[in-house]
Amino acid sequence: MDLSELERDNTGRCRLSSPVPPVCLKEPCVLGVDEAGRGPVLGPMVYAICYCPLSRLEDLEALKVADSKTLSESERDRLFAKMEEDGDFVGWALDVLSPNLISTSMLGRVKYNLNALSHDTATGLVQFALDQGVNVAQVFVDTVGLPETYQERLQQRFPGIEVTVKAKADALYPVVSAASICAKVARDQAVKNWKFVEKLQDLDTDYGSGYPNDPKTKAWLRKHVDPVFGFPQFVRFSWRTAQSILESEAEDVKWEDSETGDPKGPGKIKSYFSESPQTCLRLPHRYFQERGLESATVL
């Protein structure tokens, strides 16, 4: 799998896809959606789709695809290579979302939470398959959040397609299992070949599973936190585990626009037009304070 685009710039997202098998342009197809790396505090999250004609579903099942979490890394690599060999009837596509993208989405002024990001990424991949000309008739999705709500949303988005959203879909439907293998192979490769742009001293890659409750992962985070700049971009700053370590290990930051003289928040809009005295002190901007400048009330 060629992840060179991500390796050149691992701050955003990248999409990869196989060639579309000609048979998938003609015959009705079944498509599965799954992800890898939703929970870890380290590394990217990868969403993947896999699809094949309904008439060849038994051939996909014959590959012995299974939930990627039940397979070893070598088994996943072997099955993905087999799907690549069977490219005359199996197609796939994936979206790799960097830790930096996830963190900036979740911590932005307008919050974009992980569920919304996941839903939109999955929807985008289904639309990508349709745009490529794949004749999608059925879609099976491993749920994020309530399956009923998610299914209703997807069904409204794709009214001409039969949509099924289930928990543990990767263990129930072979086409979702195949998607989970694609996603996991891509994430494993991205993590293994991650390019650290930061100049870290004594960098080690023994960070355990990457999950927040892994002691080895926590130890790696504490070792590689900078007291001023925080973590390298390999880390999802928006995870509570990372935030807790920043609070205990890094320097406190006081922003220029921090509330200082208005602990009760902004007053009512009418107060700006009334003659009554202000109940709290409004400090001028630092530029005026440093230069000893004050508002002139009498000329």
Curated annotation (Swiss-Prot):
Protein name: Ribonuclease H2 subunit A
Provenance organism: Bos taurus (Bovine)
Modified residues annotated as Phosphoserine in this record: 258
InterPro entries: RNase_H2_suA, RNase_HII/HIII, RNase_HII/HIII_dom, RNase_HII_hlx-loop-hlx_cap_dom, RNaseH-like_sf, RNaseH_sf
Family in the record: Belongs to the RNase HII family. Eukaryotic subfamily.
Record carries keyword Ubl conjugation: no
Domain RNase H type-2, residue spans: 28-251
Annotated positions binding a divalent metal cation: 34-35, 142
Residues modified as Phosphothreonine: 205, 217
Its biological purpose: Catalytic subunit of RNase HII, an endonuclease that specifically degrades the RNA of RNA:DNA hybrids. Participates in DNA replication, possibly by mediating the removal of lagging-strand Okazaki fragment RNA primers during DNA replication. Mediates the excision of single ribonucleotides from DNA:RNA duplexes.
